[in-house]
């Protein structure tokens, strides 16, 4: 009994596969070695993403639509590739080794990108700020560098945050409390990296050189990796399950379809399930029956012709299906976020960016206000909002995960509505001063864009952190790395969706010689219409989210019941049952 208190209770092991002592491994001690990497990786990513649209238009001579599309496509790839990285980690080599291999690919991509903007033969020549057209070789090398980074991110992004969460034992009441704050502070370190990128790196890129602007985060990544490996003795590792998760997920709907003509028993106890001792002795989690997606229950009907699926296997499939419904309604919010590094930046380049008489703020640096609002909001959320709401609701998180997402989505809609209103104001100034040239500065301060940036940052404290925690918490235990890719892939597809939308909107509105809403000359476009279009589809999407959330049943978790005195799960279930607005 004493030994059970000394060793971790969730079955985590060290790198050699041996049980680990709870007192000497994991928790915040281990996570401290991971936070540095997250900060430098985000600094590298946002150092590229926040100013990439300007590099593509000014150095590689791409037009507005092409540059926005290429930024979205690359960002989308960065967020989509984690699906492969998570699957490899969960099914084959684990999070640590997947991260190790992928981080080296990431660093290689950063080195290649730094070469692409510094080596004379690999970059276009420029004189007095005007660059010659890049050769096919130069463009190809540049994009190879970018997509090498995307491949590396595929293995690092889904595994580093999940690996951090693994450092907290879900069977320990004390450590489970600590995990509640983990994702908030994990994202806080991410925001720090993004802040340095949008404030420091963007300025360095435009004033001291792109090579230095990309070289600094490359060196930072290398240093953070060294720090990461110094912490190896303190890390806890989840044991890789040998089950074929993809096969199991496909097997359930196939079996349910084959049994479609059979009558499902009224009593779920008549469905096929293994003894609980089997799960305990094999280190697996038994999942109890839930009254949702009842058509899948037919896969567990006992028949003489074939071996049925277990209730646990069916419930895992139900859980993934429920996550998919929530995931689908996160795509539009991700499309709104895609504006920050694309159209918001291009919008900013048309405005007066002077501070004082000499200093001119880079348009992409306004993205730092997204990060600043996040940095200010995370401690307030964690230290003030959560304790206050916890007293009101009895929920350890203050509000449910889906309520958190709903608040974030609503704030995003307000932000994009304000962006549309500011663009209307900009067009009035353009008309008043008879501005027609795309290079002519609109006599309107760039700080008019501050509200839309700041609100998106505040919304992200609810939205981004909430999504990451939701998909990790609600995923089946055996596929939590893969579960976090619901978060990353949603962002990725949101970027691809924005790429598709700007392309189609441009084609439709410019058809027959009409004026494109998103033309090369933003001083003669209707960006306000595009933002208004995003507001409309976001409101429709919000309605779909409320409906999907009202139908969602949270994962049953005996440990959560113990942690909250039996109130957490029951409270969330009642909230879902009483009102479709209580999500």
Curated annotation (Swiss-Prot):
| Signal peptide coordinates | none
Tell me the gene name. NPF5.1
What is the protein's species of origin?
Arabidopsis thaliana (Mouse-ear cress)
Concerning CDD domains, the annotation shows: MFS_NPF5
Matches recorded under InterPro entries: MFS_trans_sf, NRT1/PTR, POT_fam
Q: Where in the cell is it found?
A: Membrane
Alphabetic keyword roster: Membrane, Phosphoprotein, Transmembrane, Transmembrane helix, Transport
Q: What is its main location?
A: membrane
Induction (UniProt):
Down-regulated upon nematode infection.
Tissue expression remark: Expressed in flowers. Detected in stems, leaves and siliques.
Pfam families (UniProt xref): PTR2
- What name goes with this protein? Protein NRT1/ PTR FAMILY 5.1
Is Nucleus found in the keyword set? no
């Amino acid at each position: 009994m004493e030994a059970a208190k000394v060793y971790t209770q969730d079955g985590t092991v060290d790198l050699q596969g041996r049980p680990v002592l709870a007192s000497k491994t994991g928790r915040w001690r281990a996570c401290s070695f991971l936070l540095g990497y997250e900060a430098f990786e985000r600094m590298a990513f946002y150092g590229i993403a926040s100013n990439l649209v300007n590099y593509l238009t000014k150095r590689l001579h791409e037009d507005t639509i092409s540059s926005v599309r290429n930024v979205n496509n690359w960002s989308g790839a960065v967020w989509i590739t984690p699906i492969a990285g998570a699957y490899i980690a969960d099914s084959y080599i684990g999070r640590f080794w997947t991260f190790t291999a992928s981080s080296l690919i990431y660093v290689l991509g950063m080195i290649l990108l730094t070469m692409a903007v510094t080596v004379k033969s690999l970059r276009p020549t420029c004189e007095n700020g005007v660059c010659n057209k890049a050769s096919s070789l130069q463009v190809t090398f540049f994009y190879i560098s970018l997509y090498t980074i995307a491949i590396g991110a595929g293995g690092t992004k889904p595994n580093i945050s999940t690996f951090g969460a693994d450092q907290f034992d879900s069977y320990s009441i004390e450590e489970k409390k600590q995990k509640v704050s983990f994702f908030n502070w994990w994202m806080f370190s991410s925001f720090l990296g993004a802040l340095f990128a949008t404030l420091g790196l963007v300025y360095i890129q435009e004033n001291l050189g792109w090579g230095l602007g990309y070289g600094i985060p490359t060196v930072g990544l290398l240093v953070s990796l060294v720090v990461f490996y110094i912490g190896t003795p303190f890390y806890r590792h989840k044991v890789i399950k040998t089950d074929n998760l993809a096969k199991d997920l496909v097997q359930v709907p196939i079996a349910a379809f084959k049994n479609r003509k059979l009558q499902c028993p009224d009593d779920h106890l008549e469905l096929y399930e293994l003894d609980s001792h089997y799960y305990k002795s094999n280190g697996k989690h038994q999942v109890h029956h839930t009254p949702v997606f009842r058509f899948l229950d037919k896969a567990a009907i006992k028949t003489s012709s074939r071996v049925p699926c277990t209730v646990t296997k069916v419930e895992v499939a139900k859980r993934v299906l429920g996550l998919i419904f929530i995931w689908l309604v996160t795509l539009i919010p991700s499309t709104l976020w895609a504006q920050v590094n694309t159209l918001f930046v291009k919008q900013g380049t048309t405005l007066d960016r002077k501070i004082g008489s000499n200093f001119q703020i880079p348009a992409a640096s306004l993205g730092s206000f997204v990060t600043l609002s996040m940095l200010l909001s995370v401690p307030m959320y964690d230290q003030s909002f959560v304790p206050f709401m916890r007293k009101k609701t009895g929920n350890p998180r203050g509000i449910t995960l889906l309520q958190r997402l709903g608040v974030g989505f609503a704030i995003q809609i307000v932000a994009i509505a304000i962006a549309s209103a500011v663009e209307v104001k900009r067009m009035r100034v353009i008309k008043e001063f008879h501005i027609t040239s795309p290079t002519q500065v609109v006599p309107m301060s760039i700080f008019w864009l501050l509200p839309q940036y700041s609100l998106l940052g505040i919304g992200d404290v609810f939205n981004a952190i909430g999504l990451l925690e939701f998909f990790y918490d609600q995923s089946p235990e055996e596929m939590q790395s893969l579960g976090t890719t619901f978060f990353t892939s949603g962002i990725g597809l949101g970027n691809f969706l924005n790429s598709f939308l700007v392309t189609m909107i441009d084609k439709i509105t410019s058809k027959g010689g009409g004026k494109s809403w998103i033309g090369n000359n933003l001083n003669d476009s209707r960006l306000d219409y595009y933002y208004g279009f995003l507001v409309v589809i976001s409101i429709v999407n919000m309605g779909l989210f409320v409906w999907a959330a009202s139908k969602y049943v949270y994962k049953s978790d005996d440990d959560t019941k113990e942690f909250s005195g039996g109130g957490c799960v029951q409270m969330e279930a009642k909230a879902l049952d009483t009102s479709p607005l209580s999500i």
